UniProtKB/Swiss-Prot annotation:
Residues 2-223 form the Glutamine amidotransferase type-1 domain. The active site is at C86 (nucleophile), H195, E197. It is found in: Cytoplasm. Part of the FGAM synthase complex composed of 1 PurL, 1 PurQ and 2 PurS subunits. Transmembrane segments: none annotated. GO terms for molecular function: ATP binding; glutaminase activity; phosphoribosylformylglycinamidine synthase activity. Keywords: ATP-binding, Cytoplasm, Glutamine amidotransferase, Hydrolase, Ligase, Nucleotide-binding, Purine biosynthesis. This is Phosphoribosylformylglycinamidine synthase subunit PurQ. GO terms for biological process: 'de novo' IMP biosynthetic process. It catalyses: N(2)-formyl-N(1)-(5-phospho-beta-D-ribosyl)glycinamide + L-glutamine + ATP + H2O = 2-formamido-N(1)-(5-O-phospho-beta-D-ribosyl)acetamidine + L-glutamate + ADP + phosphate + H(+); L-glutamine + H2O = L-glutamate + NH4(+). The lineage of its organism: Bacteria, Bacillati, Bacillota, Bacilli, Lactobacillales. It comes from Lactobacillus acidophilus (strain ATCC 700396 / NCK56 / N2 / NCFM). SUPFAM superfamilies: Class I glutamine amidotransferase-like. Gene3D superfamilies: 3.40.50.880. The keyword Transit peptide does not apply.
Length: 223
């Protein structure tokens, strides 16, 4: 399995993501510049967190027009795995690969803390190593993480079991339906605001993010 971690101007979680795959999971992972136009040979592409292009206009709005984006879209269409974390989730919504949008937190403040998530759908390539309805502790760090979508879109997400992660107990940003992460209908594109790559070693405070990476590895072996 070969993984691409896309680096945009302003990305700051690309190293964390690389280390989670390379050091912890021993996967074959490479950094890929936003300037590239091909992702040939890769099985998974990751859009990491950060502040691509300084979050000007809207979060992810400029990154969405980078050279690499058509290749990401092609991977999604081919059924390959696409993961967007934090700013990566915002980019996926700007691309239209995932419905809805991420707006400013209800508090209008940047929130950096560990939150409790409930695994709503463990039947995806990203979550098959979690238990159904499992509660996990994952860090968040964002100012624009409040998930919004029209009621008909929210209803469709719920009916299709596309809500993958949901905030439990405290909703830190005002996301509708307490949504922390969603996938597309096909299940091969996941966007989430929390940072699983920051929860893969005990020395960092916990390993509740590790099953996500193990799930991806398992999906790659079975493909």
């Amino acid at each position: 399995m070969k993984i691409a971690v896309v680096v945009f101007p302003g990305s700051n979680c690309d190293i964390d993501m690389y280390e989670a795959f390379h050091t912890v999971c021993k996967d074959d992972v490479e950094y890929v510049s936003y300037k590239e136009k091909s992702l040939d040979g890769f099985d998974v592409v990751v859009l990491p967190g950060g502040f691509s292009y300084g979050d000007y206009l809207r979060t992810g709005a400029i990154a969405r027009f980078s050279n690499i984006i058509p290749a990401v879209e092609n991977m999604a269409k081919e059924g390959k795995l696409v993961l967007g974390v934090c700013n990566g989730f915002q980019i996926l919504t700007e691309m239209g690969l995932l419905p809805g949008a991420l707006k400013k937190n209800d508090s209008l403040q940047f929130v950096c803390k560990t939150v409790t998530l409930e695994v709503e759908n463990m039947h995806t390539p990203f979550t098959n190593e979690y238990a159904d309805k499992e509660f996990i502790q994952i860090p968040i760090a964002h100012g624009d993480g409040s998930y919004y979508a029209d009621e008909n879109v929210l209803e469709e997400l719920e009916d299709n079991h596309q809500v993958v992660f949901r905030y439990h107990g405290e909703n830190p940003n005002g996301s509708l339906h307490d949504i922390a992460g969603i996938c597309n209908k096909e299940g091969n594109v996941l966007g989430m605001m929390p940072h699983p790559e920051r929860a893969v070693e005990e020395i960092l405070g916990g390993i509740d993010g590790l099953p996500l990476f193990k799930s991806l590895l398992k999906a790659g072996v079975q493909a």
